[in-house]
Regions:
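Short amphipathic alpha-helical segments
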Residues: 1-3, 220-229, 289-298
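Conserved non-catalytic scaffold segment of RNase H-like nuclease domains
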Residues: 2-124
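Metal-dependent phosphoesterase core characteristic of DEDDh/y 3'-5' exonuclease domains
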Residues: 9-10, 63-83, 103-201, 205-226
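Residues that form generic nucleotide/phosphate-binding pockets
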Residues: 39, 98, 125, 155, ...
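Structural motif
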Residues: 58-61, 200-205, 231, 244-249
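Amphipathic, non-transmembrane alpha-helical secondary structure
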Residues: 93-96, 100, 204, 208, ...
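N-terminal cationic-hydrophobic initiation segments that often serve targeting/anchoring roles
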Residues: 99-103, 218, 258, 262
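Interfaces that engage single-stranded nucleic acids at replication/repair/recombination sites
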Residues: 231-298
Length: 298
């Protein structure tokens, strides 16, 4: 595990996903039923319908992503961002856009069993949903030693044979267990009961646990989650840049944000604003130069 000390923890992108069955109920005489039935025959499973709900979330061909949490370490605090959406395609598009902003050639993905589950599941669901994935998930053609992943399950396993659960590792290291009210087998049921907020909290606890496992393996003390802050002005600018409508409400948000900025940040914001009245990524922005002048002077 000494290799962990060679890298800056701020270059790590921590990821965890929670998955559910792709449909709330497996219907007989459908292509999905036939495919799952074949899987059951191959694995000597008798209860085709019953097994689907508990086991389908383990396979990208039969499950779907309920939410994805990404975490990063900034100023010795954990910063979290979670993506959840009933429309899985939109969820994956938003997620890949966020990864594109963070990831570079120094980025390491980190998670527990990320090489065997999270990363390939994301890759396959992107392909199924026709979503362009970030290249950091497209690793099937790479040599194993060039894949930029740190898997805490493999780091803990070392040269042994057994892979330990995240709960086992956190317990052994004296860290809080991420599994408080339920475990992964309950996610499918909770998802279709509409309890996505509970799933999100569960997912975020996993990411926090992995961050602190890595900290301890590096010989460092555990850290806490940063308190949530208001949306950064860049979020509003990005919304306009991507073709979002420039409304009176957005104008007020921008005015308030600019008024609170330092001189340096204000100059950067103005620089961004001045390039907005143009076609951005194929979309026509609705803000005008007159609007920008009013913002700067207001």
């Amino acid at each position: 595990v000494r290799i962990l000390k060679k890298y800056n923890l701020e270059d790590f992108l921590f990821i965890d996903i929670e998955t559910a069955p792709s449909v709330p109920e497996l219907v007989i005489d459908t292509p999905l039923y036939d495919a799952w039935s074949y899987y059951c025959i191959k694995n000597d499973i008798e209860d085709v319908v019953g097994s689907y709900f508990t086991e389908a979330p383990l396979y990208a061909e039969f499950g779907r992503i309920a939410c994805i949490t990404i975490g990063a370490v900034r100023n010795d605090k954990i910063v979290l961002k979670t993506f959840s959406n009933e429309d899985e395609k939109e969820l994956l598009e938003e997620f890949n856009q966020a990864v594109s902003k963070f990831a570079n050639n120094k980025t390491w993905l980190c998670g527990h069993v990320i090489t065997g589950f999270d990363a390939p599941f994301i890759m396959k669901r992107c392909l199924i949903n026709r979503v362009e994935m970030h290249q950091i998930f497209d690793m099937a053609h790479e040599k194993p030693w060039t894949v930029p992943y740190f898997d805490t399950a493999l780091l803990w396993k070392s040269t042994g044979f057994k892979v330990s659960t995240l709960v086992s590792v956190t317990t052994a290291l004296g860290l809080p267990s991420p599994k408080e009210e339920f475990n992964g087998s309950d996610v499918g049921r909770l998802y279709y009961e509409g309890k996505i907020k509970d799933i999100v909290k569960y997912c975020e606890r996993d990411v926090v646990a992995v961050v602190n496992v890595v900290r301890v393996l590096r010989g460092e003390e555990p850290i806490e989650v940063s308190e949530p802050v208001e949306q950064e002005p860049l979020g509003i600018l990005e919304y306009i840049f991507l073709g979002g409508e420039y409304t009176a409400e957005i104008a007020e948000q921008l005015k308030t944000a600019i008024s609170k900025m330092t001189k340096t940040d204000k100059a950067k914001a103005i620089e961004i604003l001045n390039v907005l009245p143009c076609k951005a990524k194929g979309k026509e922005t609705s803000i005008t130069k007159k609007d920008i002048k009013e913002l700067i002077n207001g």
